[in-house]
Amino acid sequence: EIMPSLVGSEMCIRDRSYTVGTDEFDEALSNVSSRIKKSAPVQKSITVNNGMKANQPGSRFIDFTIENGNIDGTPVSLSDYVGNGKYVLVDFWASWCAPCRGGIPGIKELYKKYAGENFEVVSVAVWDERAATLKALEEEQMPWPQIIDAQEIPSNIYGFTGIPQVILFSPDGTIIARDLHGKAIDEAVEKALKK
């Protein structure tokens, strides 16, 4: 594949990172110059690809802390919830994301269905302004823990480029499933809790 320009090459690599698996991305990357690999868009794609590779089902969760991530502005870590003896469904979302907001009623139903069981939901707001997140939280009335102002930290660590991104963690913090949407969320939670 001939890539005539730096910009064109960056776009090809970035687009490929969204549409192929991690091994195919690595193979495509091996065919480009070091100059292209060092460009900011390609470095971002490499970060996301590495995060995806490191966080497949069976991998232990990677912690992060958001300094003002609680609604009251205090620090909060993913490990405050994940790896503490409960199944945890983590929903990465943003106030401006229509599919994210559209999925909230289904997550509310799951939360209600499994209340009192060994199950928790945590929402993590990414790529969003604090005020917009707080307004959406007021509108949506999600009764589970919230981490806000996370920006790109989770997407870089967990290797995702689109939201909603829903990941189910086991009680010890191992990833059970990721990239969950719609009925797949219900099925993954039900299967995990039946064990």
List each model region and its residues.
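Conserved segment of the thioredoxin-like fold in thiol-based oxidoreductases
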Residues: 109-163
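A short beta-strand-turn-helix
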Residues: 65-88, 157
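Hydrophobic beta-strand anchors of alpha/beta hydrolase catalytic cores
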Residues: 89-90, 121, 166
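Thiol/disulfide oxidoreductase modules built on the thioredoxin-like
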Residues: 138-142, 149-193
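Single conserved hydrophobic/aromatic residue that forms the stacking wall/gate
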Residues: 1-8, 12-13
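Aromatic-flanked redox-active Cys/Sec active sites in thiol-based oxidoreductases
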Residues: 86, 91-97, 126
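Conserved redox-active cysteine motifs that mediate thiol-disulfide chemistry
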Residues: 92-109
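Long amphipathic alpha-helical scaffold segments
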Residues: 25-60, 64-66
